Amino acid sequence: MKKVIGLFLSAFLAVVPGAPVLAQRSNLAPIPTYEVHRAKIAPRIDGKLDDAAWKTATPVTFAFPWPDQTGKKQKTTARLLWDNDNLYVAYECEDSDVTAIYTKHDDPTYKDDAVEIFIAPPGVKNLYLGLEMNARGVLYDYLYPFPQRIMKNYNLPGVRLATSIKGTLNNSKDQDQGWSLEVAIPWSSFSDLADNPVPKVGDRWIANMNRWDGTEPNRRLSQWSDSGLVKPDPHYPDRFGKLVFVE
């Protein structure tokens, strides 16, 4: 499969223009590292995060790199686990007004209240999988040969996700508490990027996690690892964080 996708990408990249130079900010924080613990029992994917498994996962809180954005600074916490079948990611999002309009697979969920993970196995340069998931539980998945064009038609079979909302969706007249999301990403999703995608203890992958919150013009992007870009943009793999797989 890697050979097939390599041939496809060669043809794909040959017909798209080069990317513009991306302006970066200075004095950036060090790239973070996260130890992904092995789950003894796989969490239920129901969006509620009440499984005992999540208690063994270290929480990380997203930062707000762009002070000029006018949206509320609402807290996002993420946790990761793994086993021989899947990578598990959980997000908890404080949100006073949960909004999600898009309902179909591969809709532009990033325009809603949404969370994301971008991820690639070791040895892969500027090529990663993207999963962007809104508060409804709608998935936009793709392969991104950065900095070219996102391959929107590339799908990840077997991904399971669910959300839970504390409040009412798309009702700005009341006060919500927030929403949470769980996703299980099969290691088989990475079979085009790695011959043996199931990690071993000590393996290091690259990833970033993000949240889009609010509606235009009051919208804000928060991140685990600051992309360092001048304008709010999560896509910059040189600034992805490191995932280390541990017991």
Predicted features along the sequence, with ranges:
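Bacterial N-terminal signal peptides
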Residues: 6-16
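Structural preference for beta-rich elements and adjacent junctions enriched in aromatics
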Residues: 22-247
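Positively charged n-region of N-terminal signal peptides that target proteins for export
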Residues: 1-4
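Sec-dependent N-terminal signal peptides of Gram-negative exported proteins
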Residues: 15-23
